Amino acid sequence: QEEAQAIDQELFTEYKFSVDQLMELAGLSCATAIAKAYPPSSFTTSQPAVLVVCGPGKALFRSLLLLQGYEPTVYYPKRPSKPLFEGLTTQCQKMDIPFLPEFPAEAALIDELYGLVVDAIFGFSFKGAVREPFGSILSTLERITVPIASIDIPSGWDVEKGKADGLQPDMLISLTAPKKAAMHFTGRYHFLGGRFVPAALQEKYALNLPPYPETDCVLQLT
């Protein structure tokens, strides 16, 4: 966890990446990975309905580009009052992407309405107890049967140790580099995304990242 935070900090300070720049690149990676694993044609319904569940941090940026080509609905209960996040919310609204006023209380309702859930609630920096409303949200998501795609780390997991009795996503998209908890991931699809880590930084932290194929921004690990 500390190493991942240090890499992020160096990208911002030493390499002068901006927050929105990294979030857009990460968002493109997430969109590409999900489109590869769950193309719209693979949905059993005529409309590829996707529920994107967002936490209070940067996660919504990672999901923005995913929304193209699908029928997304966003649940975003804790919205930071910062221009970066307010601007993105406005963009979604201008694209007629609906925001749920309340999270579906029943897992069966999510199974009925959506073919995929994107878990963009917590990132690798999360620690401590899960607060409401996210505790109830995760409890519901643990009971659904439609696939879950988690971004960077399944929400509620310890970034080092994972969580055997927590969320068990079908897909994990590791950004920058896989976190230690990824060793406990047992889903079908594990992708690496975020093709923006300079070679010198990879070498400094001994990341040993596999090469990305050609011009792709994601790499399927499993």
Language model segments and positions:
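Positively charged, low-complexity intrinsically disordered leader regions
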Residues: Q1-P48, L201-T222
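Amphipathic, alpha-helical segments enriched in basic
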Residues: Q1-Q5, Q9, E112, L116, ...
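Catalytic cores of large soluble enzymes that bind and process phosphate-bearing ligands
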Residues: Y15-S18, L22, A26, P80, ...
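Nucleotide and nucleotide-moiety/phosphate-recognizing core
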Residues: T32-A120, R131-S150
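YjeF_N-associated NAD(P)HX repair module
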Residues: Y114-T222
